[in-house]
From Swiss-Prot:
Substrate binds at residues 9-11, 173, 213, 234-235. Belongs to the triosephosphate isomerase family. Homodimer. It comes from Herpetosiphon aurantiacus (strain ATCC 23779 / DSM 785 / 114-95). It is found in: Cytoplasm. The lineage of its organism: Bacteria, Bacillati, Chloroflexota, Chloroflexia, Herpetosiphonales. One of its GO terms (biological process) is glyceraldehyde-3-phosphate biosynthetic process. This is Triosephosphate isomerase.
Length: 250
């Protein structure tokens, strides 16, 4: 049985005081979870401040990006082991905003995925199509191509340590959401591709999140789909009440 993973991606929001207030509200409320996992991914600048507050709580800590090298002359970058030392257990890789604004490729994301796993971090590998690709009937081929490139060279055992996040780019921050049926269809296609890359048992073990304007009023229907195993939440994760309601989906 796959345990749902509800992750909040704060993106480039919040300073220390706002971040502390948010995680204190989350950790105070989310004390009785037994069948799902919760994660927040704040900006790098907050990791050191929030890690001690989350230690021993039900809320795990993750980062929004990392470099694939262990150290070196990479100005502005963060190494996997640095994240581990700060208490991170997850790292988001290949978010569509990284692909769009910073030119990240499947090959680069693949190097990062290998490095994350080698350093004991669980990568959340993001895939998703833009609106033109969906409208032209290319959504599945685009997503499958991203999966193959981003996960190349990973063993079945390694794949079991990866989380996939399907985020249709046209739905991120727009208020538009894929219908539960459309989201389920893509998640099922992703799981079928994971089976082709490894085996069915491995594919059945991998958590596949949905992301893209997940809100309190649509999370229940999304999470009722058989291949949707959680959510990667953007804007709604910045408000404690909204994110708590999402975590407590029914």
């Amino acid at each position: 049985m796959r345990r749902p993973l509800l992750a909040g991606n704060w993106k480039m929001h919040y300073g220390v005081s706002e971040g502390v207030a948010l995680v204190e509200a989350l950790s105070a409320d989310l004390t009785d979870l037994t069948d799902r996992d919760v994660l927040v991914c704040p900006p790098f600048t907050l990791l050191g401040s929030l890690a001690p507050l989350l230690d021993g709580t039900a809320v795990a800590l993750g980062a929004q990006n990392m470099h694939y090298e262990a150290k070196g002359a990479y100005t502005g970058e963060i190494a996997p082991q640095m994240l581990k030392e700060l208490g991170c257990s997850y790292v988001i890789l290949g978010h569509s905003e990284r692909r769009q604004y910073f030119g990240e490729t499947d090959a680069l994301i693949n190097r990062k995925a290998h490095a994350a796993l080698a350093n004991g971090l669980k990568p959340i590998v993001c895939v998703g199509e833009v609106k033109a690709e969906r409208d032209s009937g290319q959504a599945e081929s685009v997503v499958v191509g991203q999966l193959r490139g981003s996960l190349a060279g990973l063993s079945a055992e390694q794949l079991r340590g990866v989380v996939i996040a399907y985020e249709p780019v046209w739905a991120i921050g727009t208020g538009d959401t894929a219908t539960p049926a459309d989201a389920q269809a893509m998640h099922a296609r992703i799981r079928a591709e994971l089976a082709a890359l490894s085996d069915q048992a491995t594919a059945d073990a991998v958590i596949i999140q949905y992301g893209g304007s997940v809100k309190p009023d649509n999370v229940d229907e999304l999470m009722a789909q058989p291949d949707i195993d959680g959510a990667l939440v953007g804007g709604a994760s910045l408000k404690a009440a909204d994110f708590i309601r999402i975590v407590r989906f029914k």
